[in-house]
Amino acid sequence: MQSYGNPDVTYEWWAGNSVVTSRSGRFIASHIGHTGLIAFAAGGSTLWELARYNPEIPMGHQSSLFLGHLAAFGVGFDEAGAWTGVGVAAVAIVHLVLSMVYGGGALLHAVYFEADVADSEVPRARKFKLEWNNPDNQTFILGHHLFFFGMACIAFVEWARIHGIYDPAIGSVRQVNYNLDLTMIWNRQFDFIGIDSLEDVMGGHAFLAFAELTGATIHMVAGSTQWENKRLGEWSKYKGAELLSAEAVLSWSLAGIGWMAIVAAFWAATNTTVYPIEWFGEPLKLQFSVAPYWIDTADSTGITAFFGHTTRAALVNVHYYFGFFFLQGHFWHALRALGFDFKKVSEAIGNTEGATVRVEGAGFNGRAPR
């Protein structure tokens, strides 16, 4: 993390990232633990929603955020094609079991395995040590992240092709084959909010899988090749030298997740193909006040969830505001990575009485006017 040249810098307890910055083993433990928390939240919340589900009320008008996603994936339908919640409890329990597995893995990496994998006796493990200013190390790790993203896209595409997902156009679950039309994919990046074909949605994910797995291969191979053997010239400032750091990587990560959250908010607000009305409620209307926000267009009578708002309203507004604050975190850490010291801002504000103004070349140097 940014230390501004202080070799003995200390961080407060709430700066959790600083604890694992230079200890890759503990960094992995925090990742696995975080995954376990997500799995536990998903499983527990799904059971909570299922226990309170009322078939007399539209799903989008009650607490059904997790149930709605499962229904859109084609989970919970009986043989007649009606959503009854069959199999949903099993999905939730699997998530709870996995959360315990992830928790155990996190504990192992936290208390048993090496604090830094650079000290591991396993050669393969040592390749995942953290060297924040080493482009070979960072691109190698990035390649593995892209690999898992690509595999997730493939899993989604194959699930839709083999099992099927819910199609609001026909009101039932059907198998969906991807449409790998590159012209369509190129054009859809500009109007994806209005997409109304599940084949096009799957085609976009299939293309993403190809792009991410290609990028994963390139990054993993490049990361396994020493910089001087890549014949790419000198590792200069123009190519990112002295910019690559833990603080910079954190800022880019926050930018990515913030942008995805905002895009998801705009998409979920009005798209009824990927977010069917049956499961998430009616489309929303964008309003402006101190900040943008979305309001329900449906009659709130009978809505029992989220303080009288639909599932869609809760999903969209939470995503948007989380995305907004993630982007603020991105700007904060990006400026710190570039060397900007925010403490000097407060010092300057607190010292306005004795501040001096210097105008270069004008021959003036005096106290600031009061």
Curated annotation (Swiss-Prot):
Keywords assigned by UniProt, alphabetized: Chlorophyll, Chromophore, Membrane, Photosynthesis, Photosystem I, Photosystem II, Thylakoid, Transmembrane, Transmembrane helix
Cofactor: divinyl chlorophyll a; divinyl chlorophyll b
GO MF annotation terms: chlorophyll binding
A Pfam match: PSII
Subcellular localization(s) per the UniProt record: Cellular thylakoid membrane
Superkingdom, taxonomy of origin: Bacteria
Keyword Ribosomal protein found: no
Its membrane topology: Multi-pass membrane protein
Membrane-crossing segments per the record: 27-47, 88-108, 140-160, 201-221, 248-268, 315-335
GO BP term, example: photosynthetic electron transport chain
GO CC term, one of those recorded: photosystem I
Miscellaneous comment in the UniProt entry for this protein: This low-light-adapted strain contains 7 pcb genes.
Function (record text): The antenna complex functions as a light receptor, it captures and delivers excitation energy to photosystems II and I. The Prochlorales pcb genes are not related to higher plant LHCs.
Assembly mode: The antenna complex consists of divinyl chlorophylls (a and b) and divinyl chlorophyll a/b binding proteins and binds more divinyl chlorophyll b than does the antenna complex from high-light-adapted Prochlorococcus.
Similarity section: Belongs to the PsbB/PsbC family. IsiA/Pcb subfamily.
Name of the protein: Divinyl chlorophyll a/b light-harvesting protein PcbD
Protein species of origin: Prochlorococcus marinus (strain NATL2A)
Gene: pcbD
